[in-house]
């Protein structure tokens, strides 16, 4: 059974991203601008609508806002598919970086989008029933008890299991092979769960730590914990999220080329290490 070299994969991902950062920016900045602008206005409206609904008790008015959020998620997945296909091709050596801009949507982008959508659907298929059970266990409100805490841990367990097995190889598979991506990812990643988890941690944890640190520095000190009911604490959290939204959006825009470059190359490296058999052309 093939094994993914953890340290070498992480190292090569950082070397690739540092050496090709300008090209990565050229490949993704157009869809990244669209994602950032749409995300800012979508979340701004979402926070305002939820805050108003909690203050007035009229949660039924959140329908249009939730539909808008759903539309944003679909659009963001489409645009991320455009970005990842281009950068994965750069990591594979099948494309050169353009001088200043790129935007395309073809068969590979469509396959990447479907793979992202399928992964999201897979997560929701496990998470939604857990949330429904948790809500019923707490009577739809009140203070969460040990049962709810256990369900939250179960959700984290599902996420930790799914990401290395299904997501780690997804970008490379969607571009390099014409196969059902999630099924192929599950097959190839067998026996490499901890290695893939270590690679993902080595890529995302440092970047997200830096992003969180910059958010604290630029956004000022976090307010003291709010005493009172769960609703008051949630309201305070929403107000804080709304106030820091410009900073979060800006930081996300600037750090995205690094994260996409790191993840794309790590996915390609892991796929190359695990691909010990010829590509099978299976129509999804």
Tell me what each language-model feature is.
Residues 120-139, 204-222:
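Alpha-helical transmembrane segments and their membrane-interface junctions
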């Amino acid at each position: 059974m093939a094994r993914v070299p953890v340290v070498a994969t992480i190292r090569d991902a950082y070397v690739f991203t540092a050496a090709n950062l300008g090209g990565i920016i050229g490949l993704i900045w157009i869809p990244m601008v669209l994602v950032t602008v749409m995300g800012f206005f979508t979340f701004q409206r979402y926070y305002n609508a939820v805050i108003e609904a909690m203050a007035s008790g009229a949660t039924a008015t959140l329908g249009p806002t939730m539909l808008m959020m759903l539309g944003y998620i679909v659009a963001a997945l489409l645009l991320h598919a455009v970005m990842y296909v281009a950068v994965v091709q750069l990591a594979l050596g099948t494309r050169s970086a353009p001088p200043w801009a790129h935007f395309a949507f073809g068969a590979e982008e469509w396959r990447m989008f479907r793979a992202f959508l399928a992964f999201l659907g897979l997560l929701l298929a496990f998470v939604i029933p857990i949330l429904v059970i948790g809500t019923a266990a707490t009577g739809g409100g009140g203070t969460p008890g040990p049962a709810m805490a256990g369900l939250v841990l179960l959700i984290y367990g599902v996420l930790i299991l799914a990401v290395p097995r299904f997501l780690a190889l997804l970008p490379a598979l969607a571009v390099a092979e014409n196969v059902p991506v999630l099924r192929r990812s599950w097959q190839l990643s067998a026996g490499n769960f901890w290695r893939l988890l270590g690679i993902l941690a080595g890529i995302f944890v440092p970047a997200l730590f830096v992003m969180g640190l910059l958010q604290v520095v630029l956004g000022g000190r976090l307010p003291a914990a709010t005493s009172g009911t769960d609703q008051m604490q949630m309201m305070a959290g929403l107000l804080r999220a709304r106030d820091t939204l410009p900073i979060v959006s800006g930081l996300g825009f600037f750090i995205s080329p690094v994260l996409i470059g790191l993840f794309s190359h790590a996915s390609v490296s892991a796929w190359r290490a695990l691909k010990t058999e010829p590509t099978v052309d299976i129509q999804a």
